[in-house]
From Swiss-Prot:
Pfam families the record matches: Lectin_C
Protein name (database record): Snaclec anticoagulant protein subunit A
Its job: Anticoagulant protein which binds to the gamma-carboxyglutamic acid-domain regions of factors IX and factor X in the presence of calcium with a 1 to 1 stoichiometry. Also inhibits platelet aggregation by binding to platelet glycoprotein Ibalpha (GP1BA) and functioning as a blocker of vWF. Is devoid of hemorrhagic and lethal activities. Possesses antithrombotic and thrombolytic activities. Also hydrolyzes the Aalpha-chain of fibrinogen. Does not affect the Bbeta-chain and the gamma chain.
Assembly mode: Heterodimer of subunits A and B; disulfide-linked.
Amino acid sequence: MGRFIFVSFGLLVVYLSLSGTAADCSSSWSSYEGHCYKAFKQSKTWADAESFCTKQVNGGHLVSIESSGEADFVAHLIAQKIKSAKIHVWIGLRAQNKEKQCSIEWSDGSSISYENWIEEESKKCLGVHKATGFRKWENFYCEQRDPFVCEA
């Protein structure tokens, strides 16, 4: 009896220590660092892609890339899931006009903590570029229709 309790307690400790390490993503989404991601092949404008992401899952937005590890994960996800991407794939970064001052922030409202620009230009919406293995950010016209990645 004592051995059963000891083994049961040990299994409970292992379960509890592992239960917080991955996001609780549905089967069609991929998990990385506690967040869920899904790449979509259909082409949408930046605004339509952002709207689509918010309707997919509670807390969903276009992807916010906050580290080089996350950039590598997203690039790999795009390469796996969106083989038809011609030039670029939308991410959640966009220039916002706030009280006549332009600020760049992620569509989920978070500030930029990691940067990976190809070059800064005057266009307002950003995507990851195919020529860089979908790792570098580049400005594109917001009305272009392209694939995208959602994050929750």
